[in-house]
Design a protein with these regions (language model features):
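Class I SAM-dependent methyltransferase Rossmann-like catalytic core
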Residues: 30-62
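A short glycine-rich, Lys/Arg-flanked "PGG" loop and its adjoining helix->strand segment in the class I
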Residues: 82-83, 156-183
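Glycine-rich SAM-binding Motif I of class I
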Residues: 75-79
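Short glycine-dipeptide loop
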Residues: 64, 87-88, 181-187
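A short acidic, Gly/Pro-enriched loop at the edge of an enzyme's catalytic core
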Residues: 131-140, 144
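Conserved class I S-adenosyl-L-methionine
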Residues: 64-73
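S-adenosyl-L-methionine
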Residues: 103-130
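Core SAM-dependent methyltransferase catalytic element
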Residues: 221, 238-264
Protein backbone atom coordinates (compact mmCIF):
# COMPACT_ATOMS: atom_id res chain seq x y z
CA UNK A 1 0.00 0.00 0.00
CA UNK A 2 2.86 2.37 0.85
CA UNK A 3 4.47 1.65 -2.52
CA UNK A 4 1.20 2.48 -4.32
CA UNK A 5 0.88 5.71 -2.33
CA UNK A 6 4.46 6.63 -3.23
CA UNK A 7 3.81 6.09 -6.94
CA UNK A 8 0.56 8.06 -6.75
CA UNK A 9 2.35 10.92 -5.00
CA UNK A 10 5.03 10.98 -7.69
CA UNK A 11 2.37 10.89 -10.39
CA UNK A 12 0.51 13.88 -8.99
CA UNK A 13 3.74 15.81 -8.46
CA UNK A 14 4.71 15.22 -12.09
CA UNK A 15 1.23 16.23 -13.22
CA UNK A 16 1.54 19.43 -11.19
CA UNK A 17 4.87 20.26 -12.83
CA UNK A 18 3.41 19.56 -16.28
CA UNK A 19 0.45 21.86 -15.64
CA UNK A 20 2.82 24.59 -14.45
CA UNK A 21 4.93 24.25 -17.59
CA UNK A 22 1.82 24.51 -19.77
CA UNK A 23 0.39 27.60 -18.04
CA UNK A 24 0.09 30.64 -20.30
CA UNK A 25 2.32 33.57 -19.43
CA UNK A 26 0.07 36.40 -18.29
CA UNK A 27 0.34 40.01 -17.14
CA UNK A 28 1.42 39.06 -13.62
CA UNK A 29 4.33 37.01 -14.98
CA UNK A 30 5.55 39.96 -17.04
CA UNK A 31 5.17 42.36 -14.11
CA UNK A 32 7.22 39.95 -12.01
CA UNK A 33 9.92 39.95 -14.69
CA UNK A 34 9.84 43.76 -14.76
CA UNK A 35 10.35 43.87 -10.99
CA UNK A 36 13.45 41.68 -11.02
CA UNK A 37 16.54 43.30 -9.48
CA UNK A 38 19.44 44.08 -11.76
CA UNK A 39 17.47 45.28 -14.79
CA UNK A 40 19.08 48.03 -16.84
CA UNK A 41 18.04 51.55 -15.89
CA UNK A 42 17.28 52.31 -19.54
CA UNK A 43 14.85 49.37 -19.59
CA UNK A 44 13.13 50.49 -16.40
CA UNK A 45 12.76 54.01 -17.81
CA UNK A 46 11.14 52.55 -20.93
CA UNK A 47 8.57 50.39 -19.13
CA UNK A 48 5.86 53.04 -18.75
CA UNK A 49 5.82 53.97 -22.42
CA UNK A 50 6.12 50.40 -23.76
CA UNK A 51 3.70 48.62 -21.38
CA UNK A 52 5.18 45.12 -21.94
CA UNK A 53 2.82 43.67 -19.33
CA UNK A 54 -0.04 44.42 -21.75
CA UNK A 55 1.83 43.32 -24.90
CA UNK A 56 3.62 40.07 -24.07
CA UNK A 57 0.49 38.14 -22.98
CA UNK A 58 -0.82 38.47 -26.56
CA UNK A 59 1.98 36.14 -27.61
CA UNK A 60 0.24 33.28 -25.79
CA UNK A 61 3.59 31.91 -24.63
CA UNK A 62 4.26 29.25 -22.02
CA UNK A 63 7.20 28.50 -19.77
CA UNK A 64 9.82 26.71 -21.86
CA UNK A 65 8.78 28.23 -25.20
CA UNK A 66 11.09 29.55 -27.92
CA UNK A 67 10.53 33.01 -29.37
CA UNK A 68 12.26 35.46 -31.70
CA UNK A 69 12.47 39.22 -31.09
CA UNK A 70 12.87 40.53 -34.65
CA UNK A 71 14.98 43.65 -35.25
CA UNK A 72 15.36 43.80 -31.49
CA UNK A 73 17.93 46.60 -31.40
CA UNK A 74 19.28 46.74 -27.86
CA UNK A 75 17.14 43.81 -26.72
CA UNK A 76 14.64 45.42 -24.33
CA UNK A 77 11.92 42.86 -25.06
CA UNK A 78 14.41 40.01 -25.47
CA UNK A 79 15.46 40.15 -21.82
CA UNK A 80 11.88 40.31 -20.56
CA UNK A 81 10.93 37.38 -22.77
CA UNK A 82 13.92 35.38 -21.54
CA UNK A 83 12.76 35.96 -17.99
CA UNK A 84 9.20 34.76 -18.59
CA UNK A 85 9.97 31.68 -20.73
CA UNK A 86 12.72 30.67 -18.33
CA UNK A 87 15.86 28.63 -18.79
CA UNK A 88 13.84 25.83 -20.38
CA UNK A 89 12.95 28.21 -23.20
CA UNK A 90 15.03 30.27 -25.60
CA UNK A 91 14.91 33.78 -27.00
CA UNK A 92 16.53 34.75 -30.28
CA UNK A 93 17.59 38.40 -30.26
CA UNK A 94 17.49 38.98 -34.00
CA UNK A 95 19.08 41.97 -35.72
CA UNK A 96 20.32 42.96 -39.13
CA UNK A 97 23.73 44.69 -39.08
CA UNK A 98 21.92 48.04 -39.21
CA UNK A 99 19.72 47.29 -36.21
CA UNK A 100 22.71 45.78 -34.42
CA UNK A 101 24.58 49.06 -34.88
CA UNK A 102 21.57 51.12 -33.81
CA UNK A 103 21.22 49.08 -30.61
CA UNK A 104 24.94 48.68 -29.88
CA UNK A 105 24.95 50.68 -26.62
CA UNK A 106 22.03 48.73 -25.21
CA UNK A 107 23.58 45.45 -26.31
CA UNK A 108 26.90 46.36 -24.70
CA UNK A 109 25.19 47.04 -21.36
CA UNK A 110 22.84 44.05 -21.62
CA UNK A 111 25.57 41.51 -22.21
CA UNK A 112 28.13 43.00 -19.82
CA UNK A 113 30.20 40.36 -18.05
CA UNK A 114 28.77 41.23 -14.63
CA UNK A 115 25.11 40.50 -15.44
CA UNK A 116 22.93 37.66 -16.70
CA UNK A 117 20.19 38.70 -19.17
CA UNK A 118 18.81 35.15 -19.36
CA UNK A 119 18.92 32.51 -22.07
CA UNK A 120 19.27 34.76 -25.11
CA UNK A 121 20.86 33.80 -28.41
CA UNK A 122 22.15 36.77 -30.37
CA UNK A 123 21.16 36.19 -33.96
CA UNK A 124 22.44 38.73 -36.51
CA UNK A 125 21.68 38.11 -40.18
CA UNK A 126 22.03 40.20 -43.34
CA UNK A 127 19.17 42.35 -44.57
CA UNK A 128 15.76 40.80 -44.00
CA UNK A 129 17.08 37.24 -43.88
CA UNK A 130 15.88 35.52 -40.70
CA UNK A 131 17.61 32.14 -41.12
CA UNK A 132 15.39 30.42 -38.57
CA UNK A 133 14.60 26.71 -38.54
CA UNK A 134 11.24 25.62 -39.91
CA UNK A 135 8.46 25.30 -37.30
CA UNK A 136 10.95 25.78 -34.47
CA UNK A 137 9.37 28.74 -32.68
CA UNK A 138 6.32 29.30 -30.50
CA UNK A 139 6.25 33.04 -31.05
CA UNK A 140 7.65 36.01 -32.95
CA UNK A 141 7.62 39.69 -32.06
CA UNK A 142 8.50 42.83 -34.02
CA UNK A 143 8.31 46.20 -32.26
CA UNK A 144 8.52 49.55 -34.07
CA UNK A 145 10.25 48.01 -37.07
CA UNK A 146 7.63 46.63 -39.48
CA UNK A 147 7.61 49.90 -41.41
CA UNK A 148 11.32 49.44 -42.20
CA UNK A 149 10.37 46.72 -44.67
CA UNK A 150 8.71 49.40 -46.79
CA UNK A 151 11.31 52.15 -46.42
CA UNK A 152 12.90 53.43 -49.63
CA UNK A 153 16.67 53.82 -49.07
CA UNK A 154 17.78 57.41 -49.68
CA UNK A 155 21.04 59.32 -49.87
CA UNK A 156 21.73 63.04 -49.53
CA UNK A 157 23.11 64.47 -52.78
CA UNK A 158 24.10 67.85 -51.34
CA UNK A 159 20.69 69.41 -51.87
CA UNK A 160 18.11 66.79 -50.95
CA UNK A 161 17.61 63.14 -50.13
CA UNK A 162 17.06 61.03 -53.24
CA UNK A 163 16.05 57.39 -53.60
CA UNK A 164 18.96 55.02 -54.23
CA UNK A 165 17.10 51.72 -54.25
CA UNK A 166 13.84 49.90 -53.63
CA UNK A 167 12.09 48.81 -50.46
CA UNK A 168 12.57 45.27 -49.15
CA UNK A 169 10.71 42.17 -50.30
CA UNK A 170 8.05 42.19 -47.60
CA UNK A 171 6.46 38.97 -48.82
CA UNK A 172 9.75 37.12 -48.46
CA UNK A 173 10.12 38.40 -44.90
CA UNK A 174 6.58 37.43 -43.86
CA UNK A 175 6.92 33.99 -45.44
CA UNK A 176 10.04 33.42 -43.33
CA UNK A 177 8.23 34.37 -40.13
CA UNK A 178 5.34 32.06 -41.04
CA UNK A 179 7.66 29.15 -41.82
CA UNK A 180 9.60 29.54 -38.56
CA UNK A 181 6.51 29.26 -36.36
CA UNK A 182 4.99 26.05 -35.13
CA UNK A 183 1.27 25.62 -35.95
CA UNK A 184 -0.56 27.74 -33.39
CA UNK A 185 2.46 30.02 -32.93
CA UNK A 186 1.80 33.75 -32.73
CA UNK A 187 3.29 36.78 -34.46
CA UNK A 188 2.80 40.08 -32.59
CA UNK A 189 3.39 43.46 -34.20
CA UNK A 190 3.67 46.83 -32.43
CA UNK A 191 4.06 50.04 -34.40
CA UNK A 192 3.31 53.75 -34.69
CA UNK A 193 -0.09 54.31 -36.30
CA UNK A 194 -0.06 56.13 -39.64
CA UNK A 195 -2.84 57.61 -41.70
CA UNK A 196 -4.88 55.22 -43.86
CA UNK A 197 -3.61 54.77 -47.41
CA UNK A 198 -0.30 56.48 -46.65
CA UNK A 199 2.15 56.33 -49.54
CA UNK A 200 5.47 54.50 -49.23
CA UNK A 201 7.10 57.93 -49.27
CA UNK A 202 5.10 58.99 -46.20
CA UNK A 203 5.80 55.69 -44.43
CA UNK A 204 9.50 56.27 -45.09
CA UNK A 205 9.54 59.88 -43.92
CA UNK A 206 7.30 59.64 -40.82
CA UNK A 207 8.19 56.11 -39.64
CA UNK A 208 4.46 55.38 -39.38
CA UNK A 209 2.26 52.77 -41.02
CA UNK A 210 -1.47 52.06 -41.03
CA UNK A 211 -2.72 49.12 -38.96
CA UNK A 212 -5.27 48.07 -41.58
CA UNK A 213 -2.58 47.96 -44.26
CA UNK A 214 -0.24 45.88 -42.09
CA UNK A 215 -3.02 43.49 -41.19
CA UNK A 216 -3.94 42.90 -44.84
CA UNK A 217 -0.28 42.30 -45.73
CA UNK A 218 0.24 39.76 -42.95
CA UNK A 219 -3.02 37.92 -43.58
CA UNK A 220 -2.09 37.58 -47.25
CA UNK A 221 0.78 35.33 -46.17
CA UNK A 222 -1.21 32.73 -44.29
CA UNK A 223 -1.60 34.29 -40.85
CA UNK A 224 -4.95 34.61 -39.08
CA UNK A 225 -5.69 37.73 -37.02
CA UNK A 226 -6.54 36.66 -33.45
CA UNK A 227 -6.19 39.56 -31.02
CA UNK A 228 -5.23 43.19 -30.42
CA UNK A 229 -4.63 45.62 -27.58
CA UNK A 230 -5.46 49.30 -27.08
CA UNK A 231 -2.85 49.67 -24.32
CA UNK A 232 -0.67 52.01 -26.42
CA UNK A 233 -3.44 53.93 -28.17
CA UNK A 234 -3.30 57.75 -27.99
CA UNK A 235 -6.10 59.48 -29.87
CA UNK A 236 -4.50 62.93 -29.50
CA UNK A 237 -1.46 61.92 -31.58
CA UNK A 238 -0.88 63.92 -34.77
CA UNK A 239 -0.30 61.24 -37.39
CA UNK A 240 1.10 63.76 -39.85
CA UNK A 241 4.23 64.23 -37.75
CA UNK A 242 7.41 62.19 -37.63
CA UNK A 243 7.54 59.98 -34.54
CA UNK A 244 10.89 61.44 -33.44
CA UNK A 245 9.58 64.98 -32.86
CA UNK A 246 10.66 65.75 -29.31
CA UNK A 247 7.24 66.56 -27.84
CA UNK A 248 5.58 63.36 -29.12
CA UNK A 249 8.46 60.88 -29.03
CA UNK A 250 7.46 57.90 -26.89
CA UNK A 251 3.84 59.13 -26.74
CA UNK A 252 2.58 58.29 -30.23
CA UNK A 253 -0.56 56.35 -31.09
CA UNK A 254 0.59 52.74 -31.45
CA UNK A 255 -1.28 49.64 -32.58
CA UNK A 256 -0.69 46.16 -31.19
CA UNK A 257 -1.95 43.23 -33.27
CA UNK A 258 -1.53 39.48 -32.91
CA UNK A 259 -1.67 36.82 -35.62
CA UNK A 260 -1.56 33.05 -35.46
CA UNK A 261 -0.24 30.37 -37.77
CA UNK A 262 -3.23 28.05 -38.31
CA UNK A 263 -2.98 24.60 -36.74
CA UNK A 264 -4.55 22.97 -39.79
Amino acid sequence: MKRISFYLLNFFLLQSVAVELMADIDESDVLQAMAKPGRLLADINRDNRSRPEAISPLQNLELGDSVVDIFAGGGYYSELLASVVGDQGEVFLHNSPGFESWGRNGLYDRFASDRNPGKITRHTQSGINLSLNSESLDGALIVMAIHDLYVIPKRYNGEEYVAVGNSANTGYFLDQVFASLKPGGRFVIVHHQGNPESSIEVITDLHRIDETFVRSEVEAHGFVFVDSSNALRTESDDRDRIVFDEDIQGKTDRFVIAFEKPIN
